[in-house]
């Protein structure tokens, strides 16, 4: 990091690196484009929220949990929380009470900000289970975002209505009340950067695909370094569209830094739906967006020959795909739908590491194997270690799979309550198996998820990629199940048909896979048709959940036979 670079997140965001029209919007509501914020308005809103949180006696290092869907207010809340000296943590607004209770136990927040439609779930978690008067979290520490337009009106009105706030939801606090304390500057660091490295800024919940989520703590320094790693100048004006959740680490990085630091407009949607997504790209001339593999499949299955869809996507120049494994073939299909100068590429990262690999924008003549998750980004070191457990480092090995280990300035500090996460030299074991070829890295799968078939290691990711090529398959997931004689694991596929009326038979699926894979990779565990595959908000398959459903299915079959 340059010695003149600000070391706290808020200063870093507002250290604008571009000449721009200060009256132009930097954050735009994709569903209601007239709802937007300029850089000046955004900065004012952040300082107002900091003043309001300060009035609530928020102490340095306390956690504030944000339980909201994407909106143009979300980045302001994040920066205000960090700016007052607190620690941000986000929660999925669709979390069940059980899931939210787990996050509350991790975060131990001093204040919760939720929405009108999600307040009831929060109250289930914060009220005493006995129905008594004692609350787990006092009612005056649960604040509600009732109406975005009301917040914007209050923030920028010359005569804000100080009677607002307590009136909404009776004794629940409306966050407009936070806007009635004037403005207050954010906390900065007055040393050479050491405080930035040890001061927590945010906690992000890990994916929870193989167990309960943990809270990964990230410092100011780590988040700034993560942004520096992914920032890359491009030869076109950048307007971004984001449908990924802002409570997710990658969504937060995109929404926080790019609009403020580089005056690059960001259009926000609450989630991915095809029609609003295409409309936002077309209306705003979006040049960059970020997709999960599930979103890619929706796009390429939605009449890819349609001229109207192709026209809607024509302004795109860079599409970054990540969050879960994907094969090169659907990426190439998406590439073929875009402008000749567009680039579709993968990225790989974790909550704990941020984005470590990425293929950045380049012209088609210089493009790469789309099956790769990319090259190592600046600020990181990586190595592959023998998966047998010997600890042997696979130095410069080509196409030999090994467990990925990472170190660098963008790594998380620790899991909350679990300080030890790296070895003595700072290497973090990711649990992902990869191989490298010509400096590009390729994902094989998770070590825990590899299926051991009669001595062979079978990657469910590989089988899922082949299943996705079947013309009658919409989605699929593969897990290992124990053979009836207990001698081996066998691959079992859960398949979502493109149409139940024309679904393939299990035999069709078996034959399709036999023609494409080695014998030990056959779906000897069976094929099960389902309505949907359980995935997390980033698109990753929740294999623990799928295994639980599989166990229930086997028990039911045993009862009926």
From Swiss-Prot:
UniProt cross-references to PROSITE patterns, sorted A to Z: AMP_BINDING
Keyword set, alphabetical order: ATP-binding, Glycoprotein, Ligase, Membrane, Nucleotide-binding, Transmembrane, Transmembrane helix
Primary localization: membrane
Signal sequence interval, chain numbering: none
Region (AMP-binding): 462-540
Binding site for AMP: 203-214
Enzyme Commission number: 6.2.1.13, 6.2.1.17
InterPro entries: AMP-bd_C (IPR025110), AMP-bd_C_sf (IPR045851), AMP-binding_CS (IPR020845), AMP-dep_synth/lig_dom (IPR000873), ANL_N_sf (IPR042099)
Molecular-function GO term, any one: acetate-CoA ligase (ADP-forming) activity
UniProt family annotation: Belongs to the ATP-dependent AMP-binding enzyme family.
Function description: Acyl-CoA ligase; part of the gene cluster that mediates the biosynthesis of 2,4'-dihydroxy-3'-methoxypropiophenone. The first step of the pathway is the conversion of acetate into acetyl-CoA by the acyl-CoA ligase ppsA. Acetyl-CoA is then used as a starter unit by the polyketide synthase ppsB and condensed with 4 malonyl-CoA unit to produce the pentaketide backbone. During polyketide extension, the polykedite chain is probably reduced and dehydrated by the KR and PT domains, respectively.
Protein name: Acyl-CoA ligase ppsA
Gene: ppsA
């Amino acid at each position: 990091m340059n010695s003149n670079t600000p070391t706290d997140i808020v200063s870093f965001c507002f250290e604008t690196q571009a000449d721009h029209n200060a009256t132009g919007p930097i954050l735009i509501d994709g569903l209601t484009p007239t709802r937007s914020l300029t850089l000046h308005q955004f900065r004012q809103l952040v300082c107002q929220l900091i003043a309001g949180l300060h009035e609530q006696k928020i102490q340095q290092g306390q956690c504030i949990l944000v339980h909201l869907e994407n909106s143009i207010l979300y980045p302001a809340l994040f920066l205000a929380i960090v700016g007052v000296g607190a620690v941000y943590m986000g929660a999925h607004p669709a979390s069940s009470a059980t899931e939210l209770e787990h996050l509350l136990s991790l975060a131990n927040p001093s204040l919760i900000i939720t929405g009108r439609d999600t307040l009831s779930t929060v109250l289930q978690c914060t009220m005493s289970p006995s129905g008594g008067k004692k609350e787990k979290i006092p009612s005056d520490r649960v604040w509600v975002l009732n109406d975005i337009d009301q917040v914007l009106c209050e923030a920028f009105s010359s005569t804000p209505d100080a009677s607002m706030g307590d009136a909404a939801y009776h004794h629940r606090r409306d966050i407009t009340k936070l806007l009635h304390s004037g403005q207050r500057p954010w906390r900065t660091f007055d040393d050479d950067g050491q405080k930035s490295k040890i001061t927590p800024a945010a906690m992000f919940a890990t994916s929870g695909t193989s167990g309960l989520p943990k809270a990964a703590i990230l410092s100011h320094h780590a988040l700034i370094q993560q942004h520096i790693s992914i920032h890359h100048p491009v030869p076109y004006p950048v307007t971004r569209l984001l449908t990924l959740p802002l409570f997710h680490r990658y969504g937060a990085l995109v929404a926080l830094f790019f609009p403020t630091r580089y005056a690059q407009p960001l259009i926000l949607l609450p989630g991915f739906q095809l029609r609003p997504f295409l409309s936002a790209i077309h209306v705003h001339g979006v040049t960059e967006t970020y997709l999960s593999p599930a979103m890619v499949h929706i796009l390429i299955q939605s009449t890819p020959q349609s001229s109207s869809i192709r026209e809607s996507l024509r302004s795109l120049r860079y599409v970054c795909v990540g969050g879960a494994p994907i094969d090169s073939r659907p990426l190439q299909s998406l590439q073929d739908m875009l402008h000749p100068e567009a680039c579709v590429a993968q990225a790989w990262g974790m909550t704990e590491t941020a984005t470590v690999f990425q293929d950045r924008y380049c012209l088609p003549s210089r493009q790469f194997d789309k099956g790769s998750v990319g090259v190592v980004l600046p600020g990181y070191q990586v190595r592959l270690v023998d998966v047998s457990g010997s600890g042997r480092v696979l130095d410069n090995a080509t196409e030999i799979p090994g467990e990925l280990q990472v170190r660098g300035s963008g790594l998380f500090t620790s899991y909350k309550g679990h300080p030890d996460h790296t070895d003595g030299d700072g290497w973090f074991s990711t649990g992902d198996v990869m191989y490298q070829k010509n400096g590009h890295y390729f994902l094989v799968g998770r070590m825990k998820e590899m299926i051991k078939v009669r001595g062979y290691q079978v990657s469910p990711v590989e089988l899922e990629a082949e299943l996705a090529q079947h013309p009658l398959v919409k989605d699929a997931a593969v897990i290992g199940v124990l053979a009836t004689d207990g001698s081996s694991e066998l691959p079992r596929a859960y398949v979502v048909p493109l149409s139940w009326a024309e679904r393939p038979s299990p035999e069709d699926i078996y034959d399709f896979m036999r023609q494409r894979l080695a014998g030990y990779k056959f779906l000897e565990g069976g094929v099960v048709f389902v309505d949907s595959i359980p995935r997390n908000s980033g698109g990753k398959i929740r294999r623990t959940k799928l295994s639980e459903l599989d166990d229930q299915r086997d028990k039911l079959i045993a009862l009926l036979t």
